[in-house]
Structures are given as C-alpha cells and as structure tokens.
Amino acid sequence: MIRNLKLNEMRLKTWQHLNVNEVNIEEEYITEEEIIDLIKENKCKYTNVKKIYTNNESNTSFKTINTLKDIELNNINKEYNLISLNNLKTTNKQNTYITDYSYIYNKYTYELNGIINKTIKIDEIDIQNKKQNNIDNYNNIYIKEYLNIIANENSNSYLVLDLNKNNYKNINDNNKSKIEDINIQIDLKDNSKVDMVIIFPYDKIEGISLENLHINGGKKSDIHISCIFMGRKQEYFKITSLLNEETNVNIDGIYLTYANNTLDMYFDTNHIGKNGKSYININGVMIDDSRKSWKGIITFHNGCSGSEGEENENLLMLSENAKSKTLPILLCREIDVKGNHGSSSGNMDNQKIFYLMSRGHSKENARKIIIMSRFNPIIDRITNDEIKENVISIIEEEINKTNN
C-alpha cells in the first residue's frame, strides 16, 4: 500500500509533532441540532435568525425569524469543516451547556445583485432582547453566528464587513468569559466579483474566538478579501477556498499580536477546476509574550491543470518573548500547475530607524511609521472613515505601549 502512495499526496505526520495544531477542525463545538434541542427544552435563552436581502439599489430589508420551524428549514450547509474547540475543559458537556452558558444564536443571509458598495455591521446582540432574556444573569456567554453571502451571476460588489459591535461592551463587564463562534460562507456564482474587507472582533476579555470563512468559487468568478486581526485573548481562524474553472482568489491580511494573546491561522486552498489562480499574502507584527501559528496548504487536485497558487507570510518580531510557528505546504495531484510558498521574519531595521530620525522623527515615531507601513495598504482599503479610524486607533494604542 505504501508503494502506491505519492509523497506529495500525503498529509505530513510532522504537523502533529510540531504541535502547531492547537485546535480540532473536524466538527463544530456545538451543532445547530443541539441548539434546536435546547430551544425545544426552553433552555436556549435567545435566538435571532435574520435573512437580509440586498438588491442592486443597495436597499436592505430585514426579516426576523424566531420560530423553531424556520430554524429547521434554514439549516447550514455542513459539507465543509469548521473549526471547533474540543479541548475546552468541561466536566459534563450537557450540564455545562445548560447551566453555565447563555446562548445567542444569529443567522444572516446577504444576496448580492448588480453593483453593490456597502458597509455591513452585524447586530449580534439586540439590547432590548438582551434585557428581556436576562443574559446578564449568566456567568458565560456562547455566541454563534452564521453569515451567508451569495454573489449572484454577473454581480460586482464591494463590502466592508465589521464584526465589532459596541453592544458587546455592555455584556463583557458583567460576565466571566465568552465563546464567540463566527461562520461566514461566501458563494460566488458564475462571473461574479466580490471585493471585501473583513474586520474581525477585537476585545481584551477572557474568551475564545472561533472564526471560519468558506469560499465557494463559481466559474470565472473573482474575489479579493482583506482580513484584519487586531488581537483577542484566544483567536482561531480558518479559511477554506474551493476554486473552480478560472476562479481567482486573492487573500491578503494583517495581524497584530500582543500581551499573552494567541492567534492560530489556517489557510486551506483547494484548486479543483482548470486555470484557477490563488494568492495569499499575510503581514504581521508580534510584541510582548504573544503566540502565533500560521499554517497554509495549497492543494492542486486532479483536473486543475493550468492553475497557479502562491502563499507568503511576512512577520516583524518586536519582542524576544513572542513565539511564532509557520508551516506552508504545497500538495500536488496534477501536472501543468505552478505553486510557490514562503515565509520571512525579522526584527526592526535599525538603518530605517536611523534614516527616519535623520529626517526629524523621534525614535518612537520612526518605529510607528515602519510598523504602520506594513498595515496601511490593507487599512486604506476600508472606505468607511469611522471604521478606519477605529482600526488605526486600536493598532496605534498597542504600538505606543511598546515605545513606553
């Protein structure tokens, strides 16, 4: 049997030995069926399922669905893996779910037609409903959210998706911990185009963030996604891309890790159709005692001849105590394909600091300019001034701490 296996088709056993797989990615931590069971038993304190339809005039209509029947009729497609946290230390699964957690369940669907230019702010928690359900009485909160974006044929959309909400601040101060499970699925129909910036949640409370992004590319579809990670206590991110014939996927991102935060990123790119192109480029800065692992796999499946894939990570280390793990992998089952991968890491360039100081900048300001130069190309893609200013202020706040 071993003789029949090709080395570049085998998953590497060293992956486990390197201890970079901190999370299990085989199943969800809590399934939709379990949520439905809790609703039936009146043990789920809050559910909010919304369908949001956006037409080519950029008007948005909301329909709130709260019945069990509607939830059962709108089950999420589970053909792809979601990140789960199976190592959460609980003694009894059912008892922990029922007694220790207050559940918030949201589901949104955006359908894109024509030309769209829109900023989306997800209303995870409605304050009025929060008070009615006495969520503040619970020690812990489990928030599970589904966002399904459907780009119809020949549509051309630009979206800014901000997953931060001020409403969370009213809850965090009164609760011990939070588990946030965010699942985003983007379905690209044939000849559709999506340009998107995603600002992932930022806070400093004790908690865990599970973030899943799934891209299903149609024929001749094109998507460009910029991801912004500004730091959470424990953050686990996975993106799965399926590329069909002549699908183009361009993913770039920035991250900042600090304090004793953990960031785990997993990029899984699958070329299925012919002549697809995928590009991944990530820039990051690490300070303090933070931890980061970045894993990237590009797989060229049978039948994807003419496809190209590339993945790169560039890291600036500003602390000797920060720990980084990087593992890029290429797997090939087809001929006539091109694949490249790489990673680089380094410290602050003293020559650049000297040059900027010779132009009148202080050392602290010179460091800030160099760091922000890695982030600005992505931040400048945010068209909403309020969101952009918030992102810049958060990043600069953490950078200033390193200068003090």
Predicted region positions:
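Residue-level detector of solvent-exposed, low-hydrophobicity positions
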Residues: 22-24, 53, 60, 69, ...
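Long, low-complexity, mixed-charge
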Residues: 1-103
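Conserved beta-strand/loop scaffold segments within soluble protein domains that form the structured core
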Residues: 75-354, 358-361, 382, 388-404
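A generic "cationic amphipathic patch" detector
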Residues: 3-25, 199, 260, 282, ...
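Extended amphipathic alpha-helical segments enriched in small hydrophobics
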Residues: 355-377
